[in-house]
Amino acid sequence: MFQSSRLVALGLCAALVLVGGSIILSGLSPNLSSPMAAAARASSSALVALPGGRMIEVPHMTKDYRDVKVCSRQRKWEIREHMRDPIKMGLMGTKAGMTTYYDDEGIAHPVTVIALEAGNVVTQVKTKETDGYDAVQLAYKETRDRTIPWPERQHLRKHGNVKAMKHLKEFKIADVSEFTPGQQLKAEELFEVGDLVDVSGTSSGKGFQGSIRRWGMKRGPMSHGSKSHRQHGSIGCSATPSRVYKGLKMAGRMGNERKTVKKLPVMMVNDEEKYIVVRGSVPGKKGTIVELRPTKIVGKHC
């Protein structure tokens, strides 16, 4: 009698565990009808501070991203018609920061908000006949006249009578016939949701770092008696070659270098609030000036 009642109790406990596990798994599944997904969609908008202290609210993504997300190995990439040209115009922006928000299915995505401050004005159009190559020069981020050199100020006045701008950057493109000095470029005219972009900028400086953090080298013995826990190993033999090879990975300054992150999908373009949202991280810290270009390599697998 005691043994049978014990078996019944164990059976009830197992049933409760199975029911509880199914409830937990159903709550974790990214279903539109699940309460967790509904709560995620309700709180999916994120507040991001743009340069100057202005706050914007980034809403959740739409299903437009689903059709053009980073392709898998099981299906081919459908190249957009306006992305077939490998050399197209780009823009300059300011990294506002990263945030996490959810799509319509309750799945979280890490995104970076890039603010488009006053600027992105065409200051000069270069052609093969006059300069030997085709390029468009952009000016970005308004500033006071006295903060820029006099020759640069005259250059801006000569080409389109542009206001004083802090940054100038050239973009080599295939066709410059559509651009004129003084023209204001808009993000909606150059990028669409689902486009792949290459983002370039200056990475965060980390100062003087050792070989372990800088190059990921293996540390030394940590046991008692060892005096080289994080020291660099051998850098060369005393007899042959009797010197240190050039380019040997050693301790030194880390970061503060120009980096490019490729093939980031554009998640959102807002010309009214003047910002672009891309999936993933971009070089630099908040306030870093970055350049967005249509990706040069668009293949079957992304």
Curated annotation (Swiss-Prot):
InterPro entries attached to this UniProt entry: Ribosomal_uL3 (IPR000597), Ribosomal_uL3_bac/org-type (IPR019927), Ribosomal_uL3_CS (IPR019926), Transl_B-barrel_sf (IPR009000)
UniProt entry keywords in alphabetical sequence: Chloroplast, Plastid, Ribonucleoprotein, Ribosomal protein, RNA-binding, rRNA-binding, Transit peptide
Residues annotated as transmembrane: none
Spans annotated as Disordered: 208-239
Domain of life, source organism: Eukaryota
Transit peptide range per the UniProt entry: 1-36
Function comment: One of the primary rRNA binding proteins, it binds directly near the 3'-end of the 23S rRNA, where it nucleates assembly of the 50S subunit.
Family according to the record: Belongs to the universal ribosomal protein uL3 family.
Name of the protein: Large ribosomal subunit protein uL3c
Originating species: Bigelowiella natans
Annotated gene: RPL3
